[in-house]
Amino acid sequence: MRHLKSGRRLGRKTSHREAMFRNMVTSLFAHEKITTTDAKAKEIRSVAEKMITLGKRGDLHSTRIAAAFIREKSVVTKLFSTIAPRYKERAGGYTRIIKVGSRNGDAAPMSIIELVEEEFTPKASRA
């Protein structure tokens, strides 16, 4: 029984899934916006928010924990120098997930996950 087991397996083994999360979080911080499937976006949201919280703490221990997870040293520097100070007054909710329809090849539901800095303006609905 899988009672109280949180998280999605996403059809991958543990090591593959963890590597994918590390790659996606690194890309999210490098580009500040990525397009992925709904399930992956929902899973990396919690990891990304924890990394930003580490960046807000800003001490050496937090830097080392983040560097052990994020794959590129330049992205760790960006997280601690530009991304984390942007959210020093915000107590969580650093990312936004926007649903963008389905993928052409397999109709998988797709989303954009981005860092909340720019104001979101929804498209005008056709009346």
UniProtKB/Swiss-Prot annotation:
Gene Ontology biological-process entries: translation
Coiled-coil intervals, chain numbering: none
InterPro entries: Ribosomal_bL17, Ribosomal_bL17_CS, Ribosomal_bL17_sf
Transmembrane annotation, as ranges: none
Recorded family membership: Belongs to the bacterial ribosomal protein bL17 family.
NCBIfam families: L17
Protein name listed in UniProt: Large ribosomal subunit protein bL17
Phylogenetic lineage: Bacteria, Pseudomonadati, Thermodesulfobacteriota, Desulfuromonadia, Desulfuromonadales
The gene coding this protein: rplQ
